[in-house]
């Protein structure tokens, strides 16, 4: 069986080396006669897996000891509510940036708990970039400052960390582990796993200890309180054990690749060559301001959108899967997360070039 190049936005491609390990260990994990999916979450086997995964992630991202790393059930959308529930405390206001689909959904959810103050709105630029930081409307006081580092639907990525004295909260669901960054600049970071860390159903939260002291809103269920999850080391109930195990394997894979910095260089090369091809083409187009182009999700359109179905059909026939754009924007989207190889991007560029010659 030959595997295709999977450009899905999520659930996304998983490194083949990791899949081979899962295959080899699935029936009999480390000689115990059981799958890791079958063992007790409180048994020594899984506790060892969980602790090693946390150590590896802390090492990869240089997470200070003053932060807890939580492995939680649910997707990132649950965090849209958990963040204000846990961090508002006595504040009535929180600051948000509207940079695209996912930040907009977070803002809508936050309205159930507070008055979200928009520092800036990329809608002014038709979501093709971020307004200059000098123009942002920044209040002196607010519970936190929230932004999405990479908008998977819109193809926008922040090339910088926003400059603010407020507690910085960031959704890094689609680019965590794709480049180094200074964790200490943030109060809280969260990321669902199905982009760069494995399976849907697991979300990783990195939260500063000081924020765990904030009193959650009175209506916050105990299960949605960060402090309780931290106290119980993410074992309030049965966690998503297999997803946690797989994330741990991916952390090992990242280390074996040379670490996050090595992957960052590779990701930059992949994105640069794809954007270079699109920019030179008279048939394909990317509307995003080059400064804010995502390294993870490359959106593009065909000059003749009547050819969209044919493009997708022929791409699939050539082993290039899941290139259809998000239903809200249409067009095409190539998601080139950590697991996507440079060979995969080269194959896509070659196919796009051949398609343009035939139909351009």
From Swiss-Prot:
L-glutamate binds at residue 42. Binds 1 pyridoxal phosphate per subunit. Its main location: cytoplasm. The keyword Signal does not apply. Homodimer. It comes from the Bacteria. GO terms for cellular component: cytoplasm. GO terms for molecular function: O-phospho-L-serine:2-oxoglutarate aminotransferase activity; pyridoxal phosphate binding. It comes from Coxiella burnetii (strain CbuG_Q212) (Coxiella burnetii (strain Q212)). The gene is serC. InterPro entries: Aminotrans_V_dom, Aminotrans_V_PyrdxlP_BS, Pser_aminoTfrase, PyrdxlP-dep_Trfase, PyrdxlP-dep_Trfase_major, PyrdxlP-dep_Trfase_small. The keyword Amino-acid biosynthesis applies. It catalyses: O-phospho-L-serine + 2-oxoglutarate = 3-phosphooxypyruvate + L-glutamate; 4-(phosphooxy)-L-threonine + 2-oxoglutarate = (R)-3-hydroxy-2-oxo-4-phosphooxybutanoate + L-glutamate. Its EC number is 2.6.1.52. HAMAP family: SerC_aminotrans_5. The modification N6-(pyridoxal phosphate)lysine is found at residue 195. This is Phosphoserine aminotransferase. NCBIfam families: PRK05355.1, serC_1. Belongs to the class-V pyridoxal-phosphate-dependent aminotransferase family. SerC subfamily. Pfam families: Aminotran_5 (PF00266).
């Amino acid at each position: 069986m030959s595997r295709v190049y999977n450009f899905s936005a999520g659930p996304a491609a998983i490194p083949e080396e990791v899949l081979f390990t899962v295959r080899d260990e699935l029936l009999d994990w480390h000689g115990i006669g059981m799958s890791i999916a079958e063992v007790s979450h409180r048994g020594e086997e899984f506790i060892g897996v969980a602790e090693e995964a946390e150590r590896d992630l802390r090492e990869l991202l240089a997470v200070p000891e003053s932060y807890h790393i939580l492995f939680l059930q649910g997707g990132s959308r649950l965090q849209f509510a958990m963040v204000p529930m846990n961090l508002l405390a006595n504040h009535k206001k929180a600051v948000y940036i509207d940079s695209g689909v996912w930040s907009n959904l977070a803002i809508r959810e936050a309205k159930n708990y507070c008055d979200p103050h928009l520092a800036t709105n990329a809608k002014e630029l038709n979501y093709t970039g971020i307004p200059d930081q000098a123009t942002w409307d920044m209040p002196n006081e607010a519970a936190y400052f929230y932004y999405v580092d990479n908008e998977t639907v819109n193809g926008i990525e922040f090339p910088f960390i926003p400059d603010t004295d407020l507690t910085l909260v960031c959704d890094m669901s689609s680019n965590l582990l794709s480049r180094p960054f200074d964790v200490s600049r943030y109060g809280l970071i969260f990321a669902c796993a199905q982009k760069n860390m494995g399976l849907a159903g697991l979300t990783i939260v990195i939260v500063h200890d000081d924020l765990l002291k904030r009193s959650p809103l009175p209506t916050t269920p105990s299960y949605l309180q960060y402090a309780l999850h931290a106290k119980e080391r993410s074992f309030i109930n049965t966690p998503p054990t297999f997803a946690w195990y797989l994330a741990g394997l991916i952390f090992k894979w990242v280390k074996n690749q040379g670490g996050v910095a090595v992957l960052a260089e590779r990701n930059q090369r992949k994105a640069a060559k794809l954007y270079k091809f699109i920019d030179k083409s008279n048939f394909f187009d990317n509307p995003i301001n080059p400064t804010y182009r995502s390294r993870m999700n490359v959106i593009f359109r065909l000059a003749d959108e009547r050819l969209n179905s044919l493009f997708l059909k022929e791409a699939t026939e050539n082993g290039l899967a899941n290139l259809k754009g998000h239903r809200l924007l249409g067009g095409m989207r190539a998601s080139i997360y950590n697991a996507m190889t440079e060979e995969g991007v080269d194959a896509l560029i070659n196919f796009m070039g051949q398609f343009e010659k035939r139909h351009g």
